[in-house]
Amino acid sequence: MASNVTNKMDPHSMNSRVFIGNLNTLVVKKSDVEAIFSKYGKIAGCSVHKGFAFVQYDKEKNARAAVAGEDGRMIASQVVDINLAAEPKVNRGNAGVKRSAAEMYGSSFDLDYGFQRDYYDGMYSFPARVPPPPPIALAVVPSKRQRLSGNTSRRGKSGFNSKSGKRGSSKSGKLKGDDLQAIKQELTQIKQKVDSLLENLEKIEKEQSKQEVEVKNAKSEEEQSSSSMKKDETHVKMESEGGAEDSAEEGDPLDDDVNEDQGDDQLELIKDDEKEAEEGEDDRDSTNGQDDS
């Protein structure tokens, strides 16, 4: 069995490669394709995809013989469209009766013709007056092949249009240089803005720290003043209470004088009473004496 390599881009491989379009790949397998095309020469590689296939021969004459012998043939109830990979057909007519995709796969089967268009458009630059080739029926393309087609299209353009490729590369290089300069300027501006913002943030932090220190100092001063005021108030209270007690103990000097005067009066009264009593006794004695005489 031949290998699966059918994507070499050298001129010899391109000219000895056969493209088979409108192939019913639900029925036709790789072994069937090799059996049909091996009669024209030795096959170096064969790859079957959804709706189409490639056959790589060792010699260009074998590939041309296969195109001449098999183009328009009915394979698995479909008329295949065969040509050299290096010489695609510009206008493909509706040779024979082709079955629609709805008949083959049902109404829900989706077709993707993008790979076939990209494959030929990338390799060849058609004149403006010639329309691009129409899509080949049942050319459903897998995602892996699409990525390969992007690489092949770039290679094809660089191989056949070297001057345009060089010009495009020089322009892209200049554009890249300009873009780099612009990006560099933008980055420097952003850096300056960031530095200024950082400086502003540092200033704000310093101011906030100063304000916090001032607030703390003010609070401490208030606390100290309030504590000193409380101490003074307590001292004054203590002094006032002590003075009241002293005054209560000492008493009023006027009251003492009054008390002394009252005591003197009482003594005088007592003395007067004693005198009167003595005088009364003397009178009695004198009257008694007179009576005795």
Swiss-Prot record:
The keyword Ribonucleoprotein applies. InterPro entries: hnRNP_C (IPR017347), Nucleotide-bd_a/b_plait_sf (IPR012677), RBD_domain_sf (IPR035979), RRM_dom (IPR000504), RRM_HNRPC/RALY_subfam (IPR051186). The keyword Cell inner membrane does not apply. One of its GO terms (cellular component) is ribonucleoprotein complex. It holds the Pfam family RRM_1. Residues 16-87 form the RRM domain. Residues 206-222, 229-240 have a biased composition (Basic and acidic residues). It comes from the Eukaryota. Its main location: nucleus. Keywords: Coiled coil, Nucleus, Ribonucleoprotein, RNA-binding. Residues 242-267, 275-284 have a biased composition (Acidic residues). SMART domains: RRM. It is found in: Nucleus. Residues 177-225 form a coiled coil. Residues 137-177, 206-293 are annotated as: Disordered. One of its GO terms (molecular function) is RNA binding. May play a role in nucleosome assembly by neutralizing basic proteins such as A and B core hnRNPs. Belongs to the RRM HNRPC family. RALY subfamily. This is Heterogeneous nuclear ribonucleoprotein C-like 1. It comes from Homo sapiens (Human). The lineage of its organism: Eukaryota, Metazoa, Chordata, Craniata, Vertebrata. The gene is HNRNPCL1.
